[in-house]
Amino acid sequence: MNPLISSASVIAAGLAVGLASIGPGVGQGTAAGQAVEGIARQPEAEGKIRGTLLLSLAFMEALTIYGLVVALALLFANPFV
């Protein structure tokens, strides 16, 4: 295996996980903050807000998992070899 391709795959895998987690991390923080603010304003809507928050957090976390899958594919099933 070419060492240049091998090292580029490791760097790309690290970037895939790192960059794939930036957006969802910011989005999850914003969503959680807005949910807490909404619950503080309307405590009677806490159940509905919490359910919507958990669903949206799961969708955001899926983006990070996709980045992890790409990184694992680059490390263990390298298509460039």
Swiss-Prot record:
Q: Does the keyword rRNA-binding apply?
A: no
The name on file for this protein is ATP synthase subunit c, chloroplastic
Q: How does it assemble?
A: F-type ATPases have 2 components, F(1) - the catalytic core - and F(0) - the membrane proton channel. F(1) has five subunits: alpha(3), beta(3), gamma(1), delta(1), epsilon(1). F(0) has four main subunits: a(1), b(1), b'(1) and c(10-14). The alpha and beta chains form an alternating ring which encloses part of the gamma chain. F(1) is attached to F(0) by a central stalk formed by the gamma and epsilon chains, while a peripheral stalk is formed by the delta, b and b' chains.
GO terms of molecular function:
lipid binding; proton-transporting ATP synthase activity, rotational mechanism
Q: Where in the cell is it found?
A: Plastid, Chloroplast thylakoid membrane
Q: Which GO terms describe its cellular component?
A: chloroplast thylakoid membrane; proton-transporting ATP synthase complex; proton-transporting two-sector ATPase complex, proton-transporting domain
Query: What's this protein's family per the entry?
Result: Belongs to the ATPase C chain family.
- Its biological purpose: F(1)F(0) ATP synthase produces ATP from ADP in the presence of a proton or sodium gradient. F-type ATPases consist of two structural domains, F(1) containing the extramembraneous catalytic core and F(0) containing the membrane proton channel, linked together by a central stalk and a peripheral stalk. During catalysis, ATP synthesis in the catalytic domain of F(1) is coupled via a rotary mechanism of the central stalk subunits to proton translocation.
State the UniProt keywords alphabetically. Answer: ATP synthesis, CF(0), Chloroplast, Hydrogen ion transport, Ion transport, Lipid-binding, Membrane, Plastid, Thylakoid, Transmembrane, Transmembrane helix, Transport
Species of origin: Ceratophyllum demersum
**What more is known?**
In plastids the F-type ATPase is also known as CF(1)CF(0).
Membrane topology note: Multi-pass membrane protein
Q: HAMAP family, alphabetically? A: ATP_synth_c_bact
